[in-house]
Amino acid sequence: MFPLKDAEMGAFTFFASALPHDVCGSNGLPLTPNSIKILGRFQILKTITHPRLCQYVDISRGKHERLVVVAEHCERSLEDLLRERKPVSCSTVLCIAFEVLQGLQYMNKHGIVHRALSPHNILLDRKGHIKLAKFGLYHMTAHGDDVDFPIGYPSYLAPEVIAQGIFKTTDHMPSKKPLPSGPKSDVWSLGIILFELCVGRKLFQSLDISERLKFLLTLDCVDDTLIVLAEEHGCLDIIKELPETVIDLLNKCLTFHPSKRPTPDQLMKDKVFSEVSPLYTPFTKPASLFSSSLRCADLTLPEDISQLCKDINNDYLAERSIEEVYYLWCLAGGDLEKELVNKEIIRSKPPICTLPNFLFEDGESFGQGRDRSSLLDDTTVTLSLCQLRNRLKDVGGEAFYPLLEDDQSNLPHSNSNNELSAAATLPLIIREKDTEYQLNRIILFDRLLKAYPYKKNQIWKEARVDIPPLMRGLTWAALLGVEGAIHAKYDAIDKDTPIPTDRQIEVDIPRCHQYDELLSSPEGHAKFRRVLKAWVVSHPDLVYWQGLDSLCAPFLYLNFNNEALAYACMSAFIPKYLYNFFLKDNSHVIQEYLTVFSQMIAFHDPELSNHLNEIGFIPDLYAIPWFLTMFTHVFPLHKIFHLWDTLLLGNSSFPFCIGVAILQQLRDRLLANGFNECILLFSDLPEIDIERCVRESINLFCWTPKSATYRQHAQPPKPSSDSSGGRSSAPYFSAECPDPPKTDLSRESIPLNDLKSEVSPRISAEDLIDLCELTVTGHFKTPSKKTKSSKPKLLVVDIRNSEDFIRGHISGSINIPFSAAFTAEGELTQGPYTAMLQNFKGKVIVIVGHVAKHTAEFAAHLVKMKYPRICILDGGINKIKPTGLLTIPSPQI
């Protein structure tokens, strides 16, 4: 969007038509409210940016089908020129006509027709240039079908529009209706407006509405519309004095038959504008972040660099986009409904005043005044920015231009920098409501994203702090590594040819996050359908599973006007976190995933694991929807956003920790209940504190050795070829180097049945060497777990017999032979190392042996005794022998 500059923000309101409550659609579901339909169609208007159009910003849905639209606004309009009752100069008229046509032409390219063109909807900015307002009303209301008022103003309606009359469906079923108005109807409206400017007065003021409409239709019988209009209003002398170019323009605009009337595009190329058109440079839309065109192609610096600062004033807020300013206005306490109430646009009516005077038994009423609130109030209320500016008065100018090369730039400088630093430690929900904090975060992320992928590392770094909601969609795309010509790729996919999956998609979409107004709109359903179908068609080796729609929902919501980016994000997300989950036969993938999850529960919470296993409440009964949809099926979108902000910073094993964190929030209830109660508990999942869940997930992840979550069906490591601009550091709370190469010390794949038989996870020899700090190998260092403490990070328990232990063992390990480790009651045999094992309870304990069955049984015994963080060395002591790291105790003399 363009910067706010000298413009203002305005709001206007109207009601959508109410639908009967007892009528269902053809699919058997309740009818979608018209306000929801309008809200969905409105979204595309936010993407239409042009210097001659007022930028649409937002739409808000209120009670009783009320809608409030926020858009760019200017106080002056052509209405003000007409109030002066003086003819406007011909040169000005031609410039106004050309600028209006520029706006109309651009709208038409996007399939939009104004239909409500009038002097008060043609605004003038501070420099006197034209901006068309309310140009999307006809589009968003489905050509007027979804509202109880006509779109347009009688004096300016084209004859063909009047001839069609007002069409209103009453049976809520498809029926034949007239074709919508085309671009040529706006040309007629422009002709009437230009005529009024030329003569300095408004037309048809002495006629009532029905007479105006009749008069306009009778123009079909005259030879010269222009002369008849001039004679009717007593201004023939003024018209005759106009230059030939202006007369020619008016005649072309006021051609009665639309087939002979030019379109805005044709009219702009007409010779009447031969002197005006060279004064304007054609508008080129700036390249977006993920476009195939070169973003810096039109970036040129002036010869005199000081010219850049010439027009700089102290109003830095005006340099931000109108979308950002509106977002901050809302955070600073802006209330749309309150603004409209203050201007008496919204008026409350006592309920007793709405009662009818007379009522029949069949419900027919009489004597009830017409409710005029359903009609259009055309007033636009200017939204005051005083409260926002007052809130940001202490923010220095340097905060609007952070230095990206500065190490301290993660919190931009301002007069209240200490407050910002303090704000960064506050709970996320408070930070997201802090106006000054969000301003700084939005500006910083905006700058970083404009430098993507060059600034990819810094985006990762800043995302660890938090992601501003306004920038979440693009930030997620950057974290997922989306690059390239995503629009060309998406457009090349066939989304129209019927495929067998279509029926299932049609069934799933009306059940997917339909509490959300945007996703429940028909426009949202259509976008869902296209994105899901594009994914299915472009991945022939995978299939559509129920749950894919839920997975798509966050990406579609954040990129509602950019289906290509939603598709690209989804296509990058699934291989990373759900590799091969959508195979036709995915049972082996899911079973391995659930087994590893079960081991993670035992690793972090053995007491809970023991209880769930005893009652037979296995992950297969509750966790498949969690992981197949990455929790989007069980949490609402606002919780998913905060959860995925962190998920996208971790690797493919982080979801295990989220799952364990959810169970730990329900821990007391799970431990106190049996199988049936647990089933009921998960059928309607209780409220989960997402911020706590994220915090605990990170803590669990830090305690988990990177190889403990190894899966043979995970995404294979990608070859490391990222020499510049890529992310070279590990995921932030991860002990994992990104995609480490497989070595002899890595974990080996084992059959699924063997994996299921083991309660505790295995860790690789790499992890053991790294965590024991037995050698200094840069490849295996874990940056997030470094500590200055000399205390060991884990305890190695060697369960071989004492003779084997003496021949060579891991430095610092203790020996508890398996054969004599436990009593008949399952308790640990008291020995010299029992106390040490007890002291290490709560830290990572690695069981090492040379018989896999024995190590698994020993680990299972410790889990039964509620020892957390128990794991097994994959491959046993034999994996360590080739490294030369085994030590032999000095002989005692």
Curated annotation (Swiss-Prot):
Main location: cytoplasm
Keywords tagged on the record: Cytoplasm, Cytoskeleton, Disease variant, Endosome
Single GO MF descriptor: ATP binding
InterPro entries cross-referenced by the UniProt entry: Kinase-like_dom_sf (IPR011009), Prot_kinase_dom (IPR000719), Rab-GAP-TBC_dom (IPR000195), Rab-GAP_TBC_sf (IPR035969), Rhodanese-like_dom (IPR001763), Rhodanese-like_dom_sf (IPR036873)
GO BP, sorted A to Z: actin cytoskeleton organization; cell population proliferation; regulation of TOR signaling
Domains (record comment): The protein kinase domain is predicted to be catalytically inactive.
UniProt-recorded name of the protein: TBC domain-containing protein kinase-like protein
Species the sequence originates in: Homo sapiens
